[in-house]
Amino acid sequence: MSSLDELIQKARMLLSEGHSPGQIADELSLSMETVTWLLTQKKGDTAPKDVHIDWTVVSSNGHLLDGIASLMIERYYCAHPFESVEGQCPSLGSNAIVGIALSGVPLATLIAQKEQMKLAIYHPAKHSSGENPVGSISGNFSQVGGENAIIVDDVITSGRTMHEVVRYLRRHKATPLAIWVLFDKLGIKEVEGVPVYSVFTISRID
């Protein structure tokens, strides 16, 4: 069985278990367009150009996940060599971490714990139902009004969710300072003026 056949089977299995296309896209680290194709494609149809990322070896292991969270913090510090004050630790310049559900949440939680910051959770519109789905901040965690925030997720695929969360934060009087991701499939430097700090950039060579 080819890796494409396996992806098709996995996408259809997740759908049969009640996952929405948006949730399937997150589970497989694929774009919504690719997931739609996996679920509906007919034999001979051309597949969308995308890259499947499987990092479950890390994401399923608490110790490794903790190490990746530390790596994301260090990556930001390396890009911003803060002038140190004797006897004090450098500061991120932010007081809140916004984790994007689903896969951004454990990373954001670990980062917030390490940096002693507030933790907010964002549910993107693609996880909502109804005719006009909208994204929202969970009421069970920190709110974002008036906060300087760092946005955290595992993958940038199409960039739509990042645009969505940046606009949401600004509408709710928060200031997005940076976007941290493990994998960037677009190779972008910023989203609506907010700088992107990825650990890995994924490029497709056709």
From Swiss-Prot:
Domain of life where this protein originates: Archaea
PROSITE patterns assigned: PUR_PYR_PR_TRANSFER
SUPFAM superfamilies: PRTase-like
Biological process, per Gene Ontology: pyrimidine nucleobase biosynthetic process; regulation of gene expression; UMP biosynthetic process
CDD domains tied to this protein: PRTases_typeI
GO molecular function list: DNA binding; orotate phosphoribosyltransferase activity
Keyword Cytoplasm tagged: no
UniProt keyword list: DNA-binding, Transcription, Transcription regulation
Keyword Hydrolase: no
Coiled coil: none
Entry-linked InterPro entries: GfcR-like (IPR022854), PRibTrfase_dom (IPR000836), PRTase-like (IPR029057)
NCBIfam families assigned to the protein according to its UniProt record, in alphabetical order: PRK02277.1
Family membership noted in the UniProt record: Belongs to the purine/pyrimidine phosphoribosyltransferase family. GfcR subfamily.
Description of its domains: Contains an N-terminal DNA-binding winged helix-turn-helix domain and a C-terminal regulatory domain (or effector binding domain) resembling phosphoribosyltransferase (PRT) domain.
Record's protein name: Transcriptional regulator GfcR
